[in-house]
Amino acid sequence: MNTLKRLIILTILLSLLAFSFPSTCLFAAPNPPQKNVIFMIMDGTNSDIVTLSRWYRGTDLQLDKILVGGTRTYSAQSAITDSAAAGSAMATGMKTKADYIGMNPDGRPVLTVLEGAKLDGYKTGIVATSPVQHATPAAFTSHVLNREEFGDIGEQQVYQGLDVILGGGAAWLKPKSKDHVKNDDGMLKTKEVSREDGENLVEIIGAEGYDLVLKRDGLLKRKGASKLWGAFAEEDIAYEMDRKTLKPDEPSLAEMTRAAIQRLSQSEKGFFLMVEGSKVDWAAHKNDPVGMISEVLSFDDAVGEALKFAREDRNTMVVAVTDHGNSGLTLGNQGTNGDYKNQPVEKFVEPLRKAELTVKGAVSQLKEDHSNLKEVLSNYGLGNLSKKEFCAMEDASKKAEDLEDEMVKLMAKRANLGFTTHGHTGEDVFLYAYGPGKPVGLIENTDIPRVISKYLGFSLSSGEFVSWYVDGAEFYRERGFDVKIEGRTSKNPVMVVKRGDEKLRFPENKDFYWENGEKVRLKSVNVYDGQTFYVHVEG
């Protein structure tokens, strides 16, 4: 009995002793878990092409497993948005005007969710199958009034300090480059694409510590945690269906997504990654159902890579959405009016499955003498043409664009598909999401970056972020400085600020200024819209 009492007393004393010490003495304080966001955008995709792609593949899509709601896509000025305004809305949490990139409706630069994540210590990256300077990736990484300003966009991206950039757009990194394209007659010609300011951004990319890769093999072989820039095409990366045979040196969207995640996930705090499947939109503008399916399925494979990581990681939010509809594609057309209730799936997908290339890929193989026209048509799945149909193709083949138009019209007819437009459409679109903090329900496109920033622990509407950029001339003049813009109409304008012996020089699109000859790095790039220099001023 005495022994039992002693054991009870000893146990109580040990318990009291343990609780008398701070827990940090007994256990190491755990590091806060990583928080990651993979924001995936399938450009220009309406609901019917998602349905058609599912039927074409014959199995459920990765996207189907994470459908949670819908998104409204209108812009500040139109019921039907363009990609610049849509991308900016999803990057900044603010509706804006057509062509504006990272700008509010008044034309002032606004911090993006990617920039906010970078400032908060997260690793950041973008992936796209378009040139990385194109509207959607640009909206997360730059600030211009016109989406066509690829030179300014590309320069800002280089100086933004992102950790991973993968896609096309090599042409806008070099002072002079040449791209081989076909003219309207289907003849090869050399088109010169170059930076108008003459700067060699490839050299800057190297100086900024990036591992630069130009081919698929280089991407797949490279591992590590260093910064990574992949420029795999002068302009856009080939459609996935074409890439496999015509451009095998270019990586798939899924491969780029996997590589980006591998690099970014080595961050202790976490990462933000934006992935765009850019070219559903391009095929939709052409009314090419084969190209549209190619890119929807390519995007879905990339979603699979993101979900695989997120399910293992358990601290990753995945959001997937399209920025707007395009083409008004429908399963069913005027030809099915009288008997729409007796249309088996095969009537829609079998004509499409005969295609081995998209219309762009097929026509790119047309010889100068057009002697292989039948082969070109067959590569697009158009065999067994009537004499009337083939004559129409021969007449159209004088211009590549006309031939493409005739080919997609015949394919749509054979596959019982309808198209209402070659432009964007204004419907609500599907919202897909997975993981902690994910958005659900029918929401505005501007809600997405707010949900993301909240999960990552910052607010895009905070006073610091809202007032991040100031009118440089106004700010410094109020403090007694003389201000002038050197080279206002040149391609390399500089804001010069002077007071006594103090002289500051702010070059456009760069993340630094010169103070009496010494370079001072900034947390963001300087933005010039042709009239006003916007800068960030510490404190």
For each predicted feature, which ranges?
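Bacterial N-terminal signal peptides
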Residues: 10-22
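A post-motif C-terminal structural segment
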Residues: 35-36, 45-50, 55-88, 97, ...
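Glycine-rich anion/phosphate-binding loops
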Residues: 103-111, 148
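Sec/Tat signal peptide C-region and signal peptidase I cleavage site
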Residues: 23-27
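Bacterial N-terminal signal peptides that target proteins for export
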Residues: 2-11
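Cleaved targeting-peptide boundary
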Residues: 29-33
